[in-house]
A protein has these predicted regions:
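A short, flexible beta-alpha/helix-coil linker loop
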Residues: 146-148
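Conserved N-terminal beta1-alpha1 strand-loop-helix module at the mouth
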Residues: 1-106, 111-139, 154-160, 164-174, ...
Length: 190
């Protein structure tokens, strides 16, 4: 059964329009000062979308790091997206999250985050998952496009998945993740 479509709100449409260009994902960094320095450098270099992802941190460290990142992202006018933990995002007033298949119900997350929230979903290499989630998601992510040191067991997704999904005219931004670097980014952007 397909999820019920959710209403579009101007704030949500504006956030969705931000999903383009290079999208940075933080490293699993335990040192908040080092994380902030790395993020500051990336944002000063032009990154306008940042996903906070720290699979090794406990909830206290995640909260501390997000509280520190939020004003940095606001100062740089960068969209801050929280990976996995929509409850923590809601607690901190962050309106954007990225959810994998085991991260909870999208509609429950949207209700907690508010109607203007932005929710991206991992589709891995599944065109069917993209089609099923497009009515309730704001962007669709595919990957790992390349081998990744941070997620060595990630499911591979061929670049051809983008053409397949674009042919469906789902009207959602598409995001490629996993192992993208200076050597292969050209093939992703093509």
């Amino acid at each position: 059964m397909l999820p019920a479509p959710s209403s579009d709100y101007p704030e949500r449409q504006a956030r969705r329009a931000l999903i383009h260009g290079v999208y940075a994902i933080t490293a699993d960094e335990g040192d908040t000062a080092r994380l902030l320095a790395d993020v500051e450098a990336a944002l000063s270099g032009g990154i306008r979308i940042l996903q906070y992802r720290n699979k090794h941190a406990d909830i206290a460290l995640k909260r501390q790091q997000l509280e520190a990142l939020k004003p940095v992202c606001e100062r740089h006018q960068t969209l801050l997206i929280v990976n996995d933990d929509w409850r923590l995002a809601a607690e901190l007033g962050i309106k954007a999250v990225h959810l994998g298949e085991d991260d909870g119900d999208i509609e429950e997350a949207r209700q907690a985050l508010g109607p203007g929230s932005l929710i991206g979903v991992s589709c891995y290499a599944s065109v069917e998952r993209a089609q099923a989630l497009a009515p309730v998601a704001d962007y669709l992510a595919f990957g790992a496009l390349f081998a990744s040191g941070t997620k060595p067991l990630a499911r591979p997704a061929p670049l051809s998945v983008f053409r397949e999904v674009q042919a469906l005219s789902l009207a959602r931004p598409l995001v490629g993740i996993g192992g993208i670097d200076a050597d292969n980014i050209g093939s992703v952007l093509d």
